[in-house]
């Protein structure tokens, strides 16, 4: 069992139960999955850009990503139907907790001029953040990077409200602006 999962079971769950006055421990929100998505604008011009992103995503997530394709053609973007436009990977279980642990303890401190993420969720208990550069991940070899590529990371939780979602992620160590940081155990 990963360090973050142990911390979630031992510290975070009881704290959330106490704060939101849940009667049953099964009502306490938890993480369901983490989705990492890279949209690749140059995919229509450069066919190798998709393969480069697949390789980088495999290194930083630990599993092979799915290539996403365009649902319909848009002539203004020179986009045809079924043309590859990005890659995504869904992490669950052990890999999810390992990724979040590395993200909080290694990647976030490497972000330049970082003051915390905004604490705005989507209203359904999910939180998405955007990164401008994949080079902040230690798994990526800087010599092999041909272009800087941003990504979106979505934390899908079983929380019913945004307040529960933000509190869960804060207790797991995600640094938010204007909120105290939960100290990692």
Curated annotation (Swiss-Prot):
SUPFAM superfamilies: RL5-like
GO-annotated cellular components: ribonucleoprotein complex; ribosome
Keywords from the UniProt entry: Ribonucleoprotein, Ribosomal protein, RNA-binding, rRNA-binding, tRNA-binding
Gene3D superfamilies named in the record: 3.30.1440.10
Any Gene Ontology biological process: translation
GO molecular function term, any single one: rRNA binding
Entry keyword RNA-binding: yes
InterPro entries, alphabetized: Ribosomal_uL5, Ribosomal_uL5_bac-type, Ribosomal_uL5_C, Ribosomal_uL5_CS, Ribosomal_uL5_dom_sf, Ribosomal_uL5_N
NCBIfam families: PRK00010.1
Functional description taken from the UniProt entry: This is one of the proteins that bind and probably mediate the attachment of the 5S RNA into the large ribosomal subunit, where it forms part of the central protuberance. In the 70S ribosome it contacts protein S13 of the 30S subunit (bridge B1b), connecting the 2 subunits; this bridge is implicated in subunit movement. Contacts the P site tRNA; the 5S rRNA and some of its associated proteins might help stabilize positioning of ribosome-bound tRNAs.
Name of the protein described by the UniProt record: Large ribosomal subunit protein uL5
Organism ancestry: Bacteria, Pseudomonadati, Chlamydiota, Chlamydiia, Parachlamydiales
Gene name tied to this protein: rplE
